[in-house]
Amino acid sequence: MNKKIVVFLFLICTAYFSFAQTIKSPDEFLGYPLGSKYTPHHKIVSYFKYAVSAMPQMMKLDEYGQTNEGRPLLLAYIASVENLAKLEDIRKNNLRLTGILTDQPGNVNTPAIVWLSYNVHGNETSSSEAAMKTLYELLNPANSKTKEWLKNTVVLIDPCINPDGRDRYVNWFNQMVGKNANPDRQSREHMEPWPGGRVNHYNFDLNRDWA
């Protein structure tokens, strides 16, 4: 009888953790097909916060600052369970390999660090939509390809470098677009007023000084 109880509890726990390790796609979370409309910055932030709550064993999320208009700037760390637990060791080893840290030789066999940043120009809006899709595919338990990548790679994602410029353009576009978007560059939704969404709050092009 005791063996049956143990087996039963094991199956229950396995089913629970299998169910728990799921994540909604951007389409499911946002309620519309990704790319069918522009997503405001606060909803992008919400998706990243949702993702880290759904998959904390593979993701860490930091708010490294705020824009001049008070929008959060995020950096997500995505890795395998094993590598996420030793992020600091991987960071220090990377510094050793670059010669910045000289306390001991670097190990060339440790995971590589890949940094992906999106939407440095606010009106190049598809990039932050792609950031949500990228995050989902990296965390999706059913994606065997990205699971393999994360065995030797740590991925950093900044979903939007220029939230102020992005929202300036997204708000304009969503106010001007009709029921069906018009791809003609001369249509009203593409003719944003000065200063446009490319630049940040202070009319600075962040692609000239972002590092």
Which role fits each region the language model picked out?
Residues 70, 105, 111-113, 117-126:
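Short HxH-centered metal-ligating active-site micro-motif
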Residues 68, 81-83, 120-125, 161-166:
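Solvent-exposed loop/turn segments at secondary-structure junctions
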Residues 21-61, 68, 72:
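N-terminal hydrophobic targeting/anchoring segments and the immediately downstream early-domain regions
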